[in-house]
């Protein structure tokens, strides 16, 4: 299996300014993400940065980078430019690891790439894990996904799906022998040819309604393969509180990667 990990990194962040460079026990966050990705089976790991400050910090730790434009409207556009700068071919596979996931499990990166490699009918792949708590199922910030028999995504939603007609608002999976609902995990693998096309596709009405970019792919008829992991990934960093939590985990030398 051959694939490249791309980590988009931009300094602008409304909730946490200069987030990629946030210090986590002496190491910039984006560097910690790259160090985790380097433990995967990826042929190479590259940070797609929007400024020289990120590139200089990464270089100090031996992390490969490419400099992308600052005016990209989405992370997908930045990744597509990075693929061109790296000379990747249309049939190559890239895994998009978010730059705010410093505890990403390297085995999960491999699993998502492997899932796409095994599904030539799919343009991209992602991951999901089971939901146990009703509060998570009902939380619109927890994105749910429903699959077909081959673990291909049918739909992603902020709504509680699938909905049990006779057990609305309840933890229906605790009644009888029913499979648990699935929470989407925000890691993606793409075939490079599709990634180059994706930013040019018109936004889908459902994408705009749910504010979920992956619905654009489904709307335009592309398939998304889904790897089901047994455990939730490590915490990401969106707020100062998240950052402090990750710092404590690293300082305490906690177990940083759940098994896939």
Curated annotation (Swiss-Prot):
CDD domains, per the entry: CMP-KDO-Synthetase
Keywords carried by this UniProt record: Cytoplasm, Lipopolysaccharide biosynthesis, Nucleotidyltransferase, Transferase
InterPro entries tied to this protein: Cytidylyl_trans (IPR003329), KdsB (IPR004528), Nucleotide-diphossugar_trans (IPR029044)
Molecular functions (GO terms): 3-deoxy-manno-octulosonate cytidylyltransferase activity
Gene Ontology biological-process entries: CMP-keto-3-deoxy-D-manno-octulosonic acid biosynthetic process; lipopolysaccharide biosynthetic process
Major subcellular location class: cytoplasm
Pfam families recorded: CTP_transf_3
Enzyme Commission code(s) on record: 2.7.7.38
Coiled-coil zones: none
EC category name: transferase
Catalytic activity: 3-deoxy-alpha-D-manno-oct-2-ulosonate + CTP = CMP-3-deoxy-beta-D-manno-octulosonate + diphosphate
Recorded superkingdom: Bacteria
GO cellular component, one term: cytosol
Keyword Cytoplasm: yes
The protein's annotated pathway: Nucleotide-sugar biosynthesis; CMP-3-deoxy-D-manno-octulosonate biosynthesis; CMP-3-deoxy-D-manno-octulosonate from 3-deoxy-D-manno-octulosonate and CTP: step 1/1; Bacterial outer membrane biogenesis; lipopolysaccharide biosynthesis
Gene3D superfamilies associated with the record: Spore Coat Polysaccharide Biosynthesis Protein SpsA, Chain A
Cellular compartment(s): Cytoplasm
Family: Belongs to the KdsB family.
Role played: Activates KDO (a required 8-carbon sugar) for incorporation into bacterial lipopolysaccharide in Gram-negative bacteria.
Database matches in NCBIfam families: kdsB (TIGR00466), PRK05450.1-5 (NF003952), PRK13368.1 (NF009905)
The protein's name in its UniProt record: 3-deoxy-manno-octulosonate cytidylyltransferase
Gene responsible for this protein: kdsB
């Amino acid at each position: 299996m051959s694939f490249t990990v791309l980590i988009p990194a931009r300094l602008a962040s409304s909730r946490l300014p200069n987030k990629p460079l946030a210090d986590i026990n002496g190491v910039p966050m984006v560097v910690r993400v790259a160090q985790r990705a380097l433990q995967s089976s990826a042929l190479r790991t590259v940070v797609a940065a929007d400024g020289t400050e990120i590139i200089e910090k990464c270089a100090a730790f031996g992390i490969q980078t490419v400099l992308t434009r600052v005016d990209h409207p989405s992370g997908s556009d930045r990744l597509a430019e990075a693929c061109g700068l790296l000379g990747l071919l249309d049939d190559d596979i890239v895994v998009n690891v978010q730059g705010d996931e410093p505890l990403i499990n390297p085995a999960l990166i491999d699993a998502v790439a492997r899932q796409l490699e095994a599904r030539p009918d799919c343009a991209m792949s992602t991951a999901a894990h089971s939901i146990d708590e009703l509060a998570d199922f009902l939380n619109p910030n927890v994105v749910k996904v429903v699959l077909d028999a081959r673990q291909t995504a049918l739909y992603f939603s902020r709504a509680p799906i699938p909905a049990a007609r006779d057990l609305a608002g309840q933890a229906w999976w605790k009644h009888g022998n029913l499979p648990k609902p699935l929470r989407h995990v925000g890691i993606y693998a793409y075939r490079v040819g599709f990634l180059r096309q994706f930013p040019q596709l018109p936004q889908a009405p459902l994408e705009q309604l749910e504010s979920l970019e992956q619905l654009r792919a489904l709307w335009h008829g592309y398939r998304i393969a889904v790897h089901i992991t047994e455990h939730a990934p490590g915490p990401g960093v969106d707020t100062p509180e998240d950052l402090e939590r990750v710092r404590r985990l690293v300082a305490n030398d906690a177990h940083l990667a759940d098994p896939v």
